[in-house]
Amino acid sequence: DPSFNSWG
């Protein structure tokens, strides 16, 4: 989830 993290 890009809104929460950069990898997923």
From Swiss-Prot:
Localization annotation: Secreted
Keyword Oxidoreductase applies: no
Keywords (A to Z) from UniProt: Amidation, Neuropeptide, Secreted
InterPro entries: Kinin_peptide (IPR013202)
A GO cellular-component term linked to this record: extracellular region
Subcellular location, principal: secreted
Entry keyword annotation includes Oxidoreductase: no
Pfam families in the record: Kinin
Record family assignment: Belongs to the kinin family.
Function statement: Mediates visceral muscle contractile activity (myotropic activity).
Protein name: Kinin-3
Organism listed in the record: Periplaneta americana
